[in-house]
Amino acid sequence: MAKEEAIEIEGVILDALPNAQFKVKLENGLEVLAHVSGKIRMHYIRILAGDKVKVQISPYDITKGRITYRYK
């Protein structure tokens, strides 16, 4: 059984929560809870409220996601 591909969508950080988690408002209006990917964490990239980010969302649970890129 093949693994479903993750959905990539852009959004804006609304709020920074404890434990490196963020509330993100996506382009389509949904709000998801997203955590920071390992590469962003490894390179100490700071993410603040108002930043535009790219989020990967699993098709199985669209309420949670992973932040994979912060736009400049």
From Swiss-Prot:
Keyword Hydrolase belongs to the record: no
Intracellular or extracellular location(s): Cytoplasm
Keyword Methyltransferase: no
Keywords: Cytoplasm, Initiation factor, Protein biosynthesis, RNA-binding, rRNA-binding
Annotated ranges, domain S1-like: 1-72
GO cellular component, one term: cytosol
SUPFAM superfamilies: Nucleic acid-binding proteins
GO molecular function, one term: rRNA binding
Oligomer status and interactors: Component of the 30S ribosomal translation pre-initiation complex which assembles on the 30S ribosome in the order IF-2 and IF-3, IF-1 and N-formylmethionyl-tRNA(fMet); mRNA recruitment can occur at any time during PIC assembly.
Task performed by this protein: One of the essential components for the initiation of protein synthesis. Stabilizes the binding of IF-2 and IF-3 on the 30S subunit to which N-formylmethionyl-tRNA(fMet) subsequently binds. Helps modulate mRNA selection, yielding the 30S pre-initiation complex (PIC). Upon addition of the 50S ribosomal subunit IF-1, IF-2 and IF-3 are released leaving the mature 70S translation initiation complex.
Family: Belongs to the IF-1 family.
Protein name, per record: Translation initiation factor IF-1
Organism annotation: Chlorobium phaeobacteroides (strain DSM 266 / SMG 266 / 2430)
Gene: infA
